[in-house]
């Protein structure tokens, strides 16, 4: 006989009893009605009190059912018990000792008991956080309907966290793309949402050179003090990120900084940790940083004796990092809680290997950015980097799961870097994995969808989120699943109008529509570009000026004859809806986002995905030339990517146009992209550069370019475009240039020695050049490579 699965139904007084049939079993339900949350006032921790309030309020929001919190056992109705294991709670029955409750902090177990006519669920924590997180588990696994809550029958279960630190930085500052416009109530709600999935640490930014935002509803000092109180209420660790954005040799500024820090310590009801970044921002050597940390630690201990001081090595040179390592090994400072790894810092492997065991290692993962960041999207199609950019809505459950597992063996926990709600899914993924590294990603997303959307869309929405990540994999033009993803989200949108004002729902819809619109535009504007190139080749017969005029008319169709206009309108409407629902600022002009790189996807909605802007500028240069030279210039543009038989063109770094470029290991094998160097994506002119698009995607140096089945009797030339220097090798042999331009469009040419051609295969590699002394924007790079067979 098959095992029967039950459905528990928790109903309010107006609830309707439903029955469910599972497998071949007769219809059976276990019904909990008129639910009371039982919690005796016996040495209650703040987390326990918050758990009861959270359970009652969140169930009420989703169902309308009212679950009172009582200190006395109800005479009737069903009961959810919240208790610490150590509390002498008076229950009218005995509870099982199995499963065993772990002694590890934050652990909990959940039991089901039948008491007379009452169905009872017991959430027992080893401490008040255990009660809180056990309650969170119940909330995210219950199935919600009007006036009732269904729950798959829970076996007796127990759970403990893998990592002791699971947190997120929520800096109340103008740089943020959403929560700088929140009220205190909205801020607390978001913290509570994170708590439901296991977050136990929140980090604020109380000292930063950014005191004003056009969106602030609360003064920064007041909001940061409030966040500390929220952490106290939910028994969470409260951290502060406190960079020093000045020269530490300046005694006056140093004293002012320490004075500000002391005032913050006085105002904060709770502080558990302080994070001082070595750099990003800040530019001080460790010889000056360490004495400052000692002073900070002394002030911190004065007001919060159990708090600890931490430092990252971000921005330090290798020698400076070694200085810090040696200092710790020699001095073993008691004020130091541990080190922090993150963007622009030594690897977790290096730091863990040299850090004495008594010190913890926290990671500071960038969950918020997609490009020009710590964890870039592998080989992102340039059409997305040009439009969605660095800080778009970015659910990446599979990739961030792989990243977590790569770092997991080395870290004691994490508090992430985030600058808005757009990375909400990534926060939940890392939090859930830090509780249970074996957690299934789809199951996490099902709980996410169930809790934040509706139980009726749990499966479909979870799969829809997974599909959004797939939208960003591979060339945009050949990724037909982008259209399928939009179809799925359209169906969900139509079937669930009650979710229209749900900001998490709106974010997923925006991405689905935006991705599809971008793909449609790319296909359309590429066709327009082809028509323009054909027109250029007619210049000799119709005249160069006429060809350019007609080309302008063709290019203008991107605006005068738009494609997918209904989708475009809906994208604009969703951006407006998100601003109203969660203050997401998708435009600098319209919504006063802090910058074009800060989630301003609406400002790039119609950014050309062909070379329209570059061509407009080229036409101005060409106009002054003699007719013969005009025609020649237009022919060069028309044939830019067009090569003859046996010749090849690659746009280096463009996943859809670099067939000869060798890539490294797949991100599933190399999630941090240490062996698969990722392309660079130029953001000059605030992302509105008018350069040729092929010059905006680049590799510092490609791993290699490979060409097989070479005609051994022919002569070949390698042409390279890019910026700066180029130390080219062919089949391992350094080759000399016959032409050596250093700017964009100023081609370098390297004749291929005939002895190498006769090998039948050509492999191009580049010797690295040390340019660390240059800003990355000025460092050498490769954007295009041609292998030209002389005809």
Regions found by a protein language model. Give the residues of each.
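Beta-strand-rich ligand-recognition modules
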Residues: 694-713, 721-790
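Feature activates predominantly on carbohydrate-active enzymes
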Residues: 51-54, 58-60, 100-252, 266-270, ...
